[in-house]
Amino acid sequence: MSTRNCQGMDSVIKPLDTIPEDKKVRVQRTQSTFDPFEKPTNQVKRVHSENNACINFKTSSTGKESPKVRRHSSPSSPTSPKFGKADSYEKLEKLGEGSYATVYKGKSKVNGKLVALKVIRLQEEEGTPFTAIREASLLKGLKHANIVLLHDIIHTKETLTLVFEYVHTDLCQYMDKHPGGLHPDNVKLFLFQLLRGLSYIHQRYILHRDLKPQNLLISDTGELKLADFGLARAKSVPSHTYSNEVVTLWYRPPDVLLGSTEYSTCLDMWGVGCIFVEMIQGVAAFPGMKDIQDQLERIFLVLGTPNEDTWPGVHSLPHFKPERFTLYSSKNLRQAWNKLSYVNHAEDLASKLLQCSPKNRLSAQAALSHEYFSDLPPRLWELTDMSSIFTVPNVRLQPEAGESMRAFGKNNSYGKSLSNSKH
């Protein structure tokens, strides 16, 4: 059985040893006079997607990623910390450390609330890591119940500190604590929240690009929050091309594995499908153990080896060589992950997310309207962006148990177990 590593705190993917040296991700640190916190002056033309289509993102042929962080202060309120002051917070304990940042549990000295302090180390000759600039500039404008809240930005000579709301665990740790698959009601609520957050950022032309259980925070009330936007990309931020080494291997879509750099919001939707299956089945959907070739073989074993009929354009992708891959026929997903058959409409939704051809993947907005969610309270679709789903009566997490999926059975519905709650 494959195991997860829930300890990673990096915004940048730690390259696998099997990835060639020339393909590994490098952290770019640059300086210029550009202010990433200023609202872009150019207007982004709204993209109208047809049917369930994802939104395509075009890259710039001339733009360069070279901003420099300036100290930024936001208006404070009587219950908020004084923004921009390092002495407003107390470090309590280290939560994790990555290649360029250390994350601490902290506390506001002004209001006593717990926070997460992401302390990014700066080197004068190298400037500020662009991943940190990207994360701060994007999160500053995102206000949604299912996206981690950025409270404050503190810039000193030695460090850049991003102050986030404190959320006590993540989905990776949650699944490790409850092995064997999560309670199906909880899977549904987690997935609904994930899609809410993604729909919000996708409508604002932002890709997350690093969806994995470690980057989905879970509060003690069951709120799921998208976090770690270090690899996120906004259409208004110019770049030459997107790196094809941006998503942890297990959650990386086949088009990216095959070298495509023509990204759309469909990139994130593959990760949603992988996480959905993992929550239900209790194991990663495609736990590659060797390299990109092995990862693709695991995908094709279930979904079938693609060709021009099933995936138009696949032969033009840089790394697609038909002779490299075993010829597999596609299967019903329940043959690979039997617990999908225990929950009404789960297999159908998973099959529409896990499409090799990115153009065939369901968008986040369309997925929210899938029949899988039909037994949820209608008020969930009427919530404002900042409203938690748990403000709706009778919406709450259920107790987890190792055998929850077996006890649940095939014929139970979401509403039958709402009355029994651990909260």
Curated annotation (Swiss-Prot):
<dbReference type="GO" id="GO:0051301">
    <property type="term" value="P:cell division"/>
</dbReference>
<keyword id="KW-0808">Transferase</keyword>
<dbReference type="GO" id="GO:0005634">
    <property type="term" value="C:nucleus"/>
</dbReference>
<feature type="active site" description="Proton acceptor">
    <location>
        <position position="210"/>
    </location>
</feature>
<feature type="modified residue" description="Phosphoserine">
    <location>
        <position position="88"/>
    </location>
</feature>
<dbReference type="InterPro" id="IPR000719">
    <property type="entry name" value="Prot_kinase_dom"/>
</dbReference>
<dbReference type="GO" id="GO:0005524">
    <property type="term" value="F:ATP binding"/>
</dbReference>
<dbReference type="GO" id="GO:0016055">
    <property type="term" value="P:Wnt signaling pathway"/>
</dbReference>
<keyword id="KW-0472">Membrane</keyword>
<comment type="function">
    <text>Serine/threonine-protein kinase involved in the control of the eukaryotic cell cycle, whose activity is controlled by an associated cyclin. Acts as a cell-cycle regulator of Wnt signaling pathway during G2/M phase by mediating the phosphorylation of LRP6 at 'Ser-1490', leading to the activation of the Wnt signaling pathway. Acts as a regulator of cell cycle progression and cell proliferation via its interaction with CCDN3. Phosphorylates RB1 in vitro, however the relevance of such result remains to be confirmed in vivo.</text>
</comment>
<keyword id="KW-0547">Nucleotide-binding</keyword>
<comment type="similarity">
    <text>Belongs to the protein kinase superfamily. CMGC Ser/Thr protein kinase family. CDC2/CDKX subfamily.</text>
</comment>
<keyword id="KW-0597">Phosphoprotein</keyword>
<dbReference type="GO" id="GO:0106310">
    <property type="term" value="F:protein serine kinase activity"/>
</dbReference>
<keyword id="KW-1003">Cell membrane</keyword>
<protein>
    <recommendedName>
        <fullName>Cyclin-dependent kinase 14</fullName>
        <ecNumber>2.7.11.22</ecNumber>
    </recommendedName>
</protein>
<keyword id="KW-0132">Cell division</keyword>
<keyword id="KW-0879">Wnt signaling pathway</keyword>
<feature type="binding site">
    <location>
        <begin position="95"/>
        <end position="103"/>
    </location>
    <ligand>
        <name>ATP</name>
    </ligand>
</feature>
<dbReference type="GO" id="GO:0030332">
    <property type="term" value="F:cyclin binding"/>
</dbReference>
<keyword id="KW-0067">ATP-binding</keyword>
<dbReference type="InterPro" id="IPR017441">
    <property type="entry name" value="Protein_kinase_ATP_BS"/>
</dbReference>
<dbReference type="Pfam" id="PF00069">
    <property type="entry name" value="Pkinase"/>
</dbReference>
<feature type="modified residue" description="Phosphoserine">
    <location>
        <position position="32"/>
    </location>
</feature>
<feature type="compositionally biased region" description="Polar residues">
    <location>
        <begin position="49"/>
        <end position="64"/>
    </location>
</feature>
<keyword id="KW-0963">Cytoplasm</keyword>
<dbReference type="GO" id="GO:0000086">
    <property type="term" value="P:G2/M transition of mitotic cell cycle"/>
</dbReference>
<dbReference type="InterPro" id="IPR011009">
    <property type="entry name" value="Kinase-like_dom_sf"/>
</dbReference>
<dbReference type="InterPro" id="IPR050108">
    <property type="entry name" value="CDK"/>
</dbReference>
<feature type="compositionally biased region" description="Polar residues">
    <location>
        <begin position="410"/>
        <end position="423"/>
    </location>
</feature>
<feature type="region of interest" description="Disordered">
    <location>
        <begin position="49"/>
        <end position="87"/>
    </location>
</feature>
<keyword id="KW-0539">Nucleus</keyword>
<feature type="region of interest" description="Disordered">
    <location>
        <begin position="403"/>
        <end position="423"/>
    </location>
</feature>
<dbReference type="GO" id="GO:0005886">
    <property type="term" value="C:plasma membrane"/>
</dbReference>
<dbReference type="GO" id="GO:0000308">
    <property type="term" value="C:cytoplasmic cyclin-dependent protein kinase holoenzyme complex"/>
</dbReference>
<feature type="modified residue" description="Phosphoserine">
    <location>
        <position position="49"/>
    </location>
</feature>
<keyword id="KW-0418">Kinase</keyword>
<dbReference type="GO" id="GO:0004693">
    <property type="term" value="F:cyclin-dependent protein serine/threonine kinase activity"/>
</dbReference>
<comment type="subunit">
    <text>Found in a complex with LRP6, CCNY and CAPRIN2 during G2/M stage; CAPRIN2 functions as a scaffold for the complex by binding to CCNY via its N terminus and to CDK14 via its C terminus. Interacts with CCNY; CCNY mediates its recruitment to the plasma membrane and promotes phosphorylation of LRP6. Interacts with CCDN3 and CDKN1A. Interacts with SEPT8. Interacts with 14-3-3 proteina YWHAB, YWHAE, YWHAH and YWHAQ.</text>
</comment>
<dbReference type="InterPro" id="IPR008271">
    <property type="entry name" value="Ser/Thr_kinase_AS"/>
</dbReference>
<keyword id="KW-0723">Serine/threonine-protein kinase</keyword>
<feature type="binding site">
    <location>
        <position position="118"/>
    </location>
    <ligand>
        <name>ATP</name>
    </ligand>
</feature>
